[in-house]
Amino acid sequence: MGSAALQWPALLAGANARNAQLIGPLPDTPARGLMVWDVSGIDYVAEEYFLSGSANVYRPVSMADAADVASRDNFKDLGAREFSREILKAARPFTTRLIVYRPRSKQRFSGKVVAECLHPTGGGGSLMWNSLHGFFGSHGDIYVGVQHPLTIAGLKTVDSARYGSLDFEDATQLWGMLAKTGAAIKGEGAGSPLRGYRIRHLLLTGYSYTGVATATFANYHHQEAKLPDGRNIFDAYLPMADAQYVRPLNVPVMRLNTQSDYNGFGGLKNRRPDDARYRHYEFAGAAHVAVPPPADAAKPPAAIKLPSAPGQPHFSAADCRQGFPPGSLPNDYPLYLVQAAMFSNMYQWLDLRRAPPSSVFIETNAEGGTLLDDKGNAQGGVRLPQVSVPTAKYGVGSTDACVLFGYAEPFPAAVSQALYGDKAAFLARVQADIERLIADRWILPDGREQLLELARARANFEERS
């Protein structure tokens, strides 16, 4: 374990910012690191580092930088159109943790680094790695998770010997942490956790709360987050399932909202049209709480109870489902397949200037209510076979946190028979729809069989007893 000092421009930390220091990799990360995946099965290496430096303390503007999430008016914050910041204290010290997942061989590295703020529920989950480690691993991408300040106390509570030196003053130091992490990554020198890797692009992403963090950084700090030579620290942003307005930037932005998000958190008012550097997708039938990808050779962290950050909502999926239609099933929409395609399309946008597809929004009435087609599913939006060749009505909850959860209400067998005839004819329709999605770049070819398997599982052509 070693350390190296880094010379920094005044990245969100004031003119008197201290030099940042990187320490690591820490010993025995796969065995001792909290919330760290075992990635040896996909020929990756998991490492932990500590990054120390200084960052400004700001007046909060978002759930992502509030000391208590419950203290914020999320509808107002997510719809903000004015992006100045008030600095309360300049250049305050911090030490945070970085989790790095990288290919064991530098020759496998794609040149892409994906960074995310770790989620504050349960001590810091890496949501985008959880969903897309299969894609990142097969592509050779590097993932870097940046510990959210409000999750540091939980790490120290569980393992003070390992994490006792982590420290921060205020949740709003997150923005300086993200900027300095990005600058360290792109530095590629002795002070970089990725020294020796030739980095072409660094992307910031997130889902739900971490999607809000991504959009908030893009809105308030992208324009000042520069390297000494004037280059952007982050080359693209992919905020997902966060409902937040994102201002026009000088780099590509690609947004994803589910049927829970586009209207449930004020997202309907935060739409803007696609342009030369912006795409906004809404996925009909998808719910905010999405099904995980199939298990593979990467092993998730051992279950451990870590304290959540203050104000995080607590709700029961089982309680929410009691309010769903009788006989309905959990939403099975494979959001991870479209997320993988989004990253693939973003890479082509960056590397080849090949523009990604555009889509229409989910359709609504004058009051903002979702318009339904004759099968009971949302009209418009990006449409996977779940709603384009349906055997169920897909919906989301309508009250408080239950809007995060979705359901599928299966059609009676007689309805499926009337629509498609039999299972073979239904699967043929699904197959044709999948080929359309691949051709239009909404899913990748390796998602073909997973979509077919989901269709086979929901092909109810016999009455259930």
Language-model features: locations:
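C-terminal His-loop and adjacent cap/lid subdomain of alpha/beta-hydrolase
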Residues: G2-S465
